[in-house]
C-alpha cells in the first residue's frame, strides 16, 4: 500500500509538471496539431504566397490554401468570416475598419512594384513621364507614334499603331496602388477618375486579376497596362521606366522598390509608398498586407486554428520567409516594418488572452 501511494504521488507530480508546462507553452503544444488554413485575396503577391505557403507546409505540416480573387474579394471574405485571413494591397481606411464586424489588424508581408507593361516587339527601354502617363491612360494619346512619345523617347522607332489600355475588371489592390500614384501626379486624373480598388475607366478594356491583364497585354500588340512586377518578369513582358518625384526615370527592381520604403512607417503599417521622395525609388511601389481579426474567438473558431494562424504569420514576417522574396521579384520588408508586424501579431488574442508571447 505504501509503495502504491508513492507511485501515485510520482505519477501525480509528473502529470502536474506536464500540465504546468503545457499551460506555460500552450502555443507549442497546440501548434503540434495539424490544421488547414484558408486565405483569399490579392493576386499582386500571389506568386510569393504560393511559394512560401508550400515551404511552410513542408516544414510544419500545416496545410494552407490561397485563392487569388483580388483585394476586394479578400476583404469581403474576411468580412463574411469564410477565411482565416484575407489579403489586400489596399489597406482598410478608418471608415472601412469601423464597418468591419470587429477589430481588424494589418500585417505587411512583402513589398512589390506595379509596373507599366507594354507590348511593342523590338522596342525596349520606353520612358514615360508623368504627363505621358496621364494622357495615355486618360485616352488623350491614342497612337504609339504620338509626337510627345517620340520626343520623350529619342532613339526609339515607335510604330504607327493604336494604343490599347488594359486595366483590371475586378476589385483590385493593384488598381488601388496604380490609381493612388496617378492621383498624386495628375490633378486631372484625381478629379475625373480618382483612386480606388474599382474605377470608372475613361478608356480601355478590362481583364480579371493580374494573370488576366498580363495575358491580355502579352497577346495584344500595342497594348499597355499595369500589373504586379512578377507577372511581367515571369512572362517576359516589356516594362517602362517611370519618372519619379525627383524627375528620374527608374526601372522596377528589388533595390528601387526597397528605396520607396525608406521613410517612416506608422505603428499600424497603413501607409502608401507611391511617389516616394527618395531619388532612386521606383514610384509605383507598395506594401501588401494580410488582414485578420484581432480577437480570434469567433463563430466557433478553435484555439488551435487561431494559434496556427498567428504562428504562420509570425513566420511569414521572419527572416526565413522574407529571405525568399527576391526569388520571385519582391522586396523583403524593411527591418522596422517587420518588427512592427511582429508587435501587432502579439496583440492578437483568443478570449482576450494573447496567443503569442
Language model features with spans:
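Flexible loop/hinge segments at secondary-structure junctions
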Residues: 18-357
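Positively charged n-region of N-terminal signal peptides that target proteins for export
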Residues: 1-4
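C-terminal motif of bacterial Sec signal peptides marking the signal peptidase cleavage site
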Residues: 13-16
Amino acid at each position: 500500500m505504501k509503495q502504491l501511494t508513492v507511485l501515485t504521488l510520482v505519477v501525480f507530480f509528473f502529470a502536474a509538471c506536464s500540465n504546468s508546462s503545457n499551460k506555460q507553452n500552450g502555443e507549442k503544444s497546440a501548434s503540434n496539431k495539424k490544421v488547414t488554413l484558408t486565405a483569399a485575396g490579392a493576386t499582386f503577391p500571389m506568386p510569393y504566397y504560393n511559394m512560401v505557403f508550400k515551404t511552410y507546409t513542408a516544414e510544419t505540416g500545416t496545410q494552407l490554401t490561397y485563392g487569388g480573387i483580388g483585394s476586394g474579394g479578400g476583404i469581403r471574405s474576411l468580412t463574411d468570416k469564410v477565411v482565416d485571413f484575407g489579403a489586400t494591397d489596399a489597406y482598410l481606411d478608418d471608415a472601412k475598419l469601423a464597418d468591419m464586424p470587429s477589430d481588424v489588424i494589418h500585417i505587411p508581408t512583402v513589398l512589390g512594384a506595379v509596373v507599366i507593361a507594354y507590348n511593342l516587339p523590338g522596342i525596349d527601354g520606353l520612358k514615360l513621364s508623368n504627363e505621358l502617363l496621364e494622357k495615355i491612360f486618360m485616352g488623350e494619346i491614342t497612337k504609339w507614334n504620338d509626337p510627345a512619345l517620340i520626343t520623350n523617347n529619342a532613339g526609339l522607332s515607335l510604330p504607327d499603331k493604336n494604343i490599347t489600355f488594359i486595366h483590371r475588371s475586378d476589385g483590385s489592390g493593384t488598381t488601388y496602388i496604380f490609381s493612388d500614384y496617378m492621383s498624386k501626379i495628375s490633378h486631372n486624373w484625381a478629379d475625373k477618375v480618382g483612386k480606388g480598388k474599382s474605377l470608372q475607366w475613361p478608356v480601355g478594356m478590362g481583364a480579371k486579376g493580374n494573370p488576366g491583364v498580363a495575358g491580355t497585354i502579352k497577346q495584344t500588340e500595342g497594348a499597355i497596362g499595369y500589373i504586379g512586377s512578377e507577372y511581367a518578369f515571369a512572362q517576359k513582358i516589356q516594362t517602362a521606366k517611370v519618372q519619379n518625384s525627383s524627375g528620374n526615370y527608374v526601372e522596377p527592381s528589388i533595390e528601387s522598390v526597397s528605396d520607396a520604403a525608406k521613410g517612416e512607417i506608422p505603428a499600424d503599417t497603413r501607409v502608401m509608398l507611391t511617389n516616394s521622395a527618395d531619388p532612386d525609388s521606383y514610384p509605383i511601389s507598395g506594401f501588401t498586407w494580410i488582414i485578420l481579426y484581432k480577437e480570434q474567438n469567433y463563430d466557433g473558431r478553435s484555439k488551435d486554428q487561431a494559434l496556427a494562424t498567428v504562428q504562420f504569420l509570425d513566420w511569414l514576417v521572419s527572416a526565413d520567409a522574407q529571405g525568399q522574396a527576391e526569388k520571385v521579384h519582391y522586396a523583403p520588408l524593411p527591418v522596422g516594418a517587420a518588427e512592427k508586424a511582429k508587435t501587432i501579431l502579439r496583440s492578437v488574442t483568443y478570449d482576450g488572452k494573447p496567443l503569442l508571447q
